[in-house]
């Protein structure tokens, strides 16, 4: 069985004391590849250092929407310089997007940065890893303004409804499913029943959103197994089928990790 964690921040300082054990537990659980989304200028160095130590870790480059503050143009410039000067090192542009959950102060700047980074993906032929929290209307407005026939990316840690998921899939996006699927969440379970496994990729978003039975604790990439197991129960298929089809979907979406 082979699993891919398509979204994990295991370069975070939370893992400094036991990163080798975290990696070992992941491989013991069948994880063959881990994708590392960037956050901002300060996360680049620890992310790249970790990716250099393990050949099955693949970094992305992007500016997270919650990192867009007064200095956002400088932050975006730093990220762009890294991406375009070393584009062969990155498997995707990410994570990028819209987040209006806590603060709407910089909504216009978030939309501008999201649009710019989407364009980088087109320019470099890279997929995108998109973060969205309470900003679906703004996200769709940006995507519409790009006026592209199709897109190549994933909506990570998807938290929308079935209509939004279907619209995104129609546009070319895959749906990232993480630990929330193991919570008592009938809405997400019904959504997963309605979506083909070929349109789903697995993720942990470690160290956040650990699945049951680790909810409330530090998440890690090895726990993607529990996410796959829950999806297999929801869809009434074997764990092996979930692993095979979501792994193939991830390899197709991110060709540089294949």
Model-derived features: positions:
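Mid-domain alpha/beta scaffold segments of enzyme catalytic cores
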Residues: 1-258
């Amino acid at each position: 069985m082979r699993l891919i964690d398509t979204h994990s921040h295991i370069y975070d300082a939370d893992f400094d004391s036991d990163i080798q054990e975290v990696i070992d537990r992941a491989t013991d659980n069948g994880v063959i590849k881990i994708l590392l989304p960037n956050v901002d200028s300060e996360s680049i160095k620890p992310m790249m250092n970790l990716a250099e130590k393990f050949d099955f870790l693949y970094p992305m480059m992007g500016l997270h929407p919650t990192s867009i503050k007064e200095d956002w143009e400088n932050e975006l410039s730093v990220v762009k310089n890294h991406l375009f000067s070393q584009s062969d090192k990155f498997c995707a542009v990410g994570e990028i997007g819209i987040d209006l959950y806590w603060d709407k102060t910089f909504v216009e700047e978030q939309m501008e940065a999201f649009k710019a980074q989407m364009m980088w993906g087109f320019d470099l032929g890279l997929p995108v890893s998109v973060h969205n929290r309470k900003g679906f209307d703004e996200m769709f407005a940006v995507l519409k303004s790009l006026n592209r026939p199709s897109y190549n990316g994933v909506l990570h840690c998807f938290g929308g409804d079935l209509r939004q998921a279907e619209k995104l899939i129609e546009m070319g996006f895959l749906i990232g499913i993480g630990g929330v699927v193991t919570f008592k969440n009938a809405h997400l379970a019904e959504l997963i029943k309605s979506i083909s496994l070929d349109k789903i990729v697995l993720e942990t978003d470690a160290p956040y959103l650990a699945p049951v039975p680790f909810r409330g604790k530090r998440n890690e990439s090895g726990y993607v197994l529990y996410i796959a197991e829950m999806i297999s129960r929801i869809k009434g298929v074997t764990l092996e089928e979930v692993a095979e089809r979501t792994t193939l979907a991830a390899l197709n979406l991110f060709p540089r990790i294949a």
